[in-house]
Structures are given as C-alpha cells and as structure tokens.
C-alpha cells in the first residue's frame, strides 16, 4: 500500500473470555517482523496506571456515560501496578499474535485481560507509538460505556469497559510490543487485571456514593472517589494491630 500524507490508522480490540491462544516469551510466533518491546517503567507505567484510575474515578463519581448514565460507586478500588501481571502481559504482546492466552498469575489464578491493536501505514518506533497510541487504546476500551446499561450483566460488547471499572480489581500490569505485519506497523497493548472482573451474574461495583469505610477500605488520597485497601500494622509496644491505608506510590 502506498504511503500518503495522511497515514492510514486503524484499531482492533478483543476481550478475554472469547477464546484463548497459547503464549510464550518468544518474539513473534508468526511471520510478523518484531521491531521492539517496551519496558513499561517510569513515566510509561505511571501513564497507563493513571489513565485507568482516571476512568475508574470518573465512573465512581457517577460521571461516566451519556445515553446510559452510569451510577456512582461505593467501593471502587484505586489500581496499582503488578509486576507479575505485567510480565505475563509482555509474554503475550511479544508473540505478535492478537488473541487471548487465558492469562494466569504466578499462583495459577486467572487474571482479567484486555488487548488492543493499532496499526498504521507509517513507521514509528516502540516508544513513540506507545506515547501516541496507549491513551487512545485504553479510551477505546472505556468508550464501550456508551452501550452499557448498569445491571444488564456481562456482554462481550461492553466487557472491556466493565473490566476497567470492576470495583474489586486492584492490580494492573501491561505489556506493549511494536512489529510489522505485511505493509502495516502495529502496536499491541496487553493489560492483565488482578483479581479478574466480568463475573457472570455480578455487577461491576456496588451502586451508591463513595463509602469506603462501609466496605472496610480507606479513602484514596489521589482520587476523590476511589478507595484503597488497608494494611495491618503491628504496634510493637502493645502487640495490638492497627490498620493503615495503602496508597499508590
């Protein structure tokens, strides 16, 4: 395909539970040309965690959705980064195979998973493409809110959104690769979530104004409408325990 001044760009999304593919740490398990894998640390990690928490906070405040206005959430947790979830996400991203791998954590427990693929006729590189595309990829997942009616149950058409705002999910870890597929240059984002969301018969969160204490949670210092887990802290003098809020660094 000939290049033009306005490069062609398109996106694909896929949702866990639709099907699985085998994954490994190998680079491009097909005819695609591997061009790089981004180590998501520093500003790259902060960006992907922050955009997830932005959308969670927006939803928990009752400000998400237009046609289907979403109710506020009592108990939505602030997400923090998880290295185990990220390492498994990197393995899948590096295969260059667009499909789910039935992700499980180091304890063999299932994880939730969202994947997205964006392609352009113009070459970039792994760092620049992540900077330009990652926010839009996560936004595409979240934008399924337009089709979601709270309490309607799981749907493959809105499952990216419901995983992003699943209240009990507390950890996220992502991987990103960049490769050439035919004449197209592709960025592949994989995010794994712990514990997983999208349980059949369950709503993504408890409806109501934020009430962290009601659910034995602390209030986030970074997001007005999100909660954080409490860690037990032992008092060395008395032997008693106290609870302290755990905040994202």
Curated annotation (Swiss-Prot):
Residues 1-26 form the signal peptide. GO terms for biological process: superoxide metabolic process; suppression of platelet aggregation in another organism. The keyword Secreted applies. Saliva (at protein level). Salivary gland (at protein level). It is found in: Secreted. Its cofactor is Cu(2+). The keyword Ribosomal protein does not apply. One of its GO terms (molecular function) is cupric ion binding. It comes from the Eukaryota. CDD domains: CAP_euk (cd05380). Keywords: Antioxidant, Glycoprotein, Hemostasis impairing toxin, Heparin-binding, Metal-binding, Platelet aggregation inhibiting toxin, Secreted, Signal, Toxin. Does not affect blood coagulation. Does not interfere with endothelial cell proliferation. Does not exhibit vasodilation activity. Does not inhibit the complement cascade. Antioxidant protein that scavenges superoxide radicals. Removes superoxide radicals produced by PMA-stimulated host neutrophils. Inhibits host platelet aggregation induced by low doses of collagen by interfering with the pro-aggregatory properties of reactive oxygen species on platelets. Binds to heparin and sulfated glycosaminoglycans. Belongs to the CRISP family. Venom allergen 5-like subfamily. This is Salivary antigen-5. The lineage of its organism: Eukaryota, Metazoa, Ecdysozoa, Arthropoda, Hexapoda.
């Amino acid at each position: 395909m000939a290049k033009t001044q306005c490069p062609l760009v398109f996106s694909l999304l896929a949702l866990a539970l639709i099907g699985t593919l085998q994954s490994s740490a190998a680079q491009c398990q097909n005819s695609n040309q591997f061009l790089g894998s981004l180590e998501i640390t520093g500003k790259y990690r902060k960006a992907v965690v922050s955009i997830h928490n932005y959308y969670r906070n927006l939803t928990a405040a009752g400000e998400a959705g237009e046609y289907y206005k979403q109710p506020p959430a009592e108990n939505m947790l602030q997400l923090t980064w998880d290295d185990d979830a990220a390492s498994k996400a990197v393995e899948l991203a590096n295969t260059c195979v667009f499909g789910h791998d039935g992700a499980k954590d180091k304890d063999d427990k299932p994880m939730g998973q969202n994947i997205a693929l964006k392609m352009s006729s113009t070459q970039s590189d792994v760092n620049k493409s992540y900077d330009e595309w990652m926010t839009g990829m996560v936004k595409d997942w979240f934008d399924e809110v337009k089709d979601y009616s709270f309490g309607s149950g799981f749907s493959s058409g809105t499952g990216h959104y419901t995983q992003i705002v699943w209240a009990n999910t507390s950890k996220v870890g992502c991987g990103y690769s960049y490769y050439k597929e035919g004449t197209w240059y592709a960025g592949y984002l994989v995010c794994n979530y712990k514990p997983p969301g999208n349980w059949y018969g369950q709503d993504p969160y408890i409806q109501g104004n934020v009430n962290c204490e009601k659910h034995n949670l602390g209030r986030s210092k970074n997001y007005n409408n999100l909660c954080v887990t409490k860690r037990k802290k032992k008092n060395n003098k008395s032997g008693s325990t106290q609870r302290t809020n755990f905040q994202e660094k």
